[in-house]
């Protein structure tokens, strides 16, 4: 019978640990605080911001919000970012993206303080991951995948893992994390030849291609452990992953659902990064 790798127990365990860590920091006189910078008022950004604030409240983390006008200039934005960087009461920064065209995201990646960069935008934090140093602030989605694998005690040492997707946000850093835990990693993408066959021969299949229900039963075997990173519009008002869940669920060893899988853990990783950042400041 297929094991469903639900996020709920992973999140519950992480939040309980975070509550204890936050309480310990508060006892030392530190109040872990998240600074949230939002440009404009896109409904999905506002919804996610409110969700993050609620999650922070449940574990004792304070928040400061910086809602900015959609037409803010690069000069004005830089002044706000510098202010938040230099504010000792703010320990981590969350910046909503994508940004409007007048704001240069490549410049902003270098502008954000690496010590407060809990969403791992800064090249300095990504560089650590690629050097095999996992002690700093980690990219949230790859770290969420690793948290699920560890919670369910899925053995990585010597395992063959196929990562489908080569983005700098998920595929590449996740591959480095898997390598650090002694998995043998193959990175695949849209130009990979015989992709279904490559995936079917893996112990762990991680789908991060950004294509709705692309992975069907041709890509998996009965011993496959499938991690679905995708969050796509299913076209019926619902979301779906990169994996065709209904076609695959009864034909694999284990699988993460969408929703209720990787995405649900990602926000908790963000807060874990905040606590890490607070401890180091």
From Swiss-Prot:
It comes from the Bacteria. It holds the Pfam family THF_DHG_CYH. GO terms for molecular function: methenyltetrahydrofolate cyclohydrolase activity; methylenetetrahydrofolate dehydrogenase (NADP+) activity. Disulfide bonds: none annotated. Its EC number is 1.5.1.5, 3.5.4.9. It catalyses: (6R)-5,10-methylene-5,6,7,8-tetrahydrofolate + NADP(+) = (6R)-5,10-methenyltetrahydrofolate + NADPH; (6R)-5,10-methenyltetrahydrofolate + H2O = (6R)-10-formyltetrahydrofolate + H(+). One of its GO terms (cellular component) is cytosol. Keywords: Amino-acid biosynthesis, Histidine biosynthesis, Hydrolase, Methionine biosynthesis, Multifunctional enzyme, NADP, One-carbon metabolism, Oxidoreductase, Purine biosynthesis. GO terms for biological process: L-histidine biosynthetic process; methionine biosynthetic process; purine nucleotide biosynthetic process; tetrahydrofolate interconversion. SUPFAM superfamilies: Aminoacid dehydrogenase-like, N-terminal domain (SSF53223), NAD(P)-binding Rossmann-fold domains (SSF51735). Pathway: One-carbon metabolism; tetrahydrofolate interconversion. NADP(+) binds at residues 165-167, 190, 231. The keyword Hydrolase applies. Transmembrane segments: none annotated. Catalyzes the oxidation of 5,10-methylenetetrahydrofolate to 5,10-methenyltetrahydrofolate and then the hydrolysis of 5,10-methenyltetrahydrofolate to 10-formyltetrahydrofolate. Homodimer. Belongs to the tetrahydrofolate dehydrogenase/cyclohydrolase family. This is Bifunctional protein FolD 1. It comes from Desulfitobacterium hafniense (strain Y51).
